[in-house]
Design a protein with these regions (language model features):
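An alpha-helical appendage that flanks or caps ligand/catalytic pockets
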Residues: 1-2, 10, 35, 126, ...
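N-terminal beta1-alpha1-beta2 module of alpha/beta enzyme domains
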Residues: 1-73, 177, 279-289, 294-297, ...
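Flexible, glycine-rich active-site loops centered on histidine and acidic residues
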Residues: 5-22, 84-154, 202-211
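Hydrophobic faces of well-ordered beta-strands that scaffold small-molecule active sites
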Residues: 6-10, 42-44, 78-81, 109-113, ...
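Active-site mouth loops of central-metabolism enzymes
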Residues: 10-25, 82-92, 174-184, 245-259
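Alpha-helical segments flanking ligand/cofactor-binding loops in enzyme cores
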Residues: 25-28, 32, 68, 99, ...
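Conserved, mostly hydrophobic/aromatic
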Residues: 34, 38, 46, 70, ...
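A structural motif
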Residues: 36-39, 106, 196, 270-273
Length: 301
């Protein structure tokens, strides 16, 4: 059985009614403490701006910059993008970014990648494309994957191009940076089956294995369809967690005593997931510390 990994999505967005902004000294302290606690991967989300219907905009620090800073601050834990949006950047530059982050981390980088999205208004606010998102992603993959797997890309598409483009310089793992493709839909799973080391979904409505578990059978079927052994792809689940709130606080987040949170993580492992990545609320050191007994319980099994 593959090892079961637990990751932490770093709190780099404004949070709470007062839109509290986590500052770098706090983010750095959280990263170091999470590494010491034994988290397997620290992820930085790649969002730009959230516009809530009932409140002011919610800002987010740049995820790539934060990934580099976290990688330079830590020494053992893996560091990844969760997930880097192909909608925000040129695909050749995305591949170079991944190579650079692997260099900064000394070979600890996990390249989380996704199609991106237009909601809730961030694409429009930044003047980014709002249409044909998956068509754009398919073209981006025809540049990114060859660059990180063979060191070269040559492609001319409707939305993207790479003309005799070499992947230079290269970091400590030429052609071998692990690729995670995120997305709940069939298209995301198919791209993962074709190109990625790991597929990851995320629980939107309920922080429960019943929401994401059925997608594993779909992933297996897609792997069979494209001629891939389903056992060769990792399976991730992103779930929200608030260890400072009582059990049953919200259906979209796991909460309550450490044993109850640990039981939820175990249920994902038993369903066949190889990793869970925890989206922490609130983004404080106190909340991270409250997860220490959860990790101990799951690791003790």
């Amino acid at each position: 059985m593959a090892p079961f990994e637990i990751g932490l999505v770093m709190p780099i967005a404004q949070f709470g009614p007062e839109r509290t902004t986590p500052r770098w000294p706090v983010i750095r302290e959280i990263a170091l403490r999470a590494e010491a606690m034994g988290f397997d991967t620290l992820w930085t989300p790649d969002e730009l701006l959230w516009r809530a219907e009932d409140g002011p905009p919610q800002g987010v620090w740049d995820g790539v910059s934060m990934a580099g800073a976290v990688a330079a601050t830590t020494s053992r834990v893996k560091v990844g993008t969760w997930v880097l949006s192909a909608l925000h950047r040129n695909p050749g530059i995305i591949a170079k970014t991944a190579e650079t982050l692997d260099e900064i981390s000394g070979g600890r980088f996990v390249f989380g990648l996704g199609a991106g999205h237009e909601w809730p208004g961030q694409a429009r606010a930044f003047g980014l494309p709002e249409d044909r998102i998956f068509a754009r992603f398919e073209e981006a993959l025809r540049i990114i994957v060859p660059l990180i797997r063979t060191g070269h890309a040559d492609f001319e598409g409707q939305y993207h191009a790479a003309r005799d483009l070499p992947q230079q310089p290269v970091g400590p793992r030429p052609n071998a940076i692990p690729l995670l493709i995120g997305g709940n839909g069939l298209k995301g799973q198919r791209h993962a089956a074709l190109h990625a080391d790991i597929w990851s979904g995320y629980a939107e409505e309920r922080a429960h294995v019943d929401e994401l578990g059925p997608r594993l059978a779909t992933l297996d079927a897609i792997c069979d369809e494209v001629g891939r052994d389903p056992a060769t792809i990792g399976r991730g689940a992103g779930i929200s967690v608030n260890p400072l709130q009582p059990a049953g606080w919200r259906p979209t987040a796991i909460s309550g005593p450490a044993e109850e949170i640990a039981d939820t993580l175990r249920s994902f492992r038993e369903a066949g997931f190889t990793q869970v990545d925890l989206m922490l609320g609130p983004g404080t050191l106190e909340a991270v510390e409250a997860l220490a007994p959860v990790l101990e319980l799951v690791r003790a099994d």
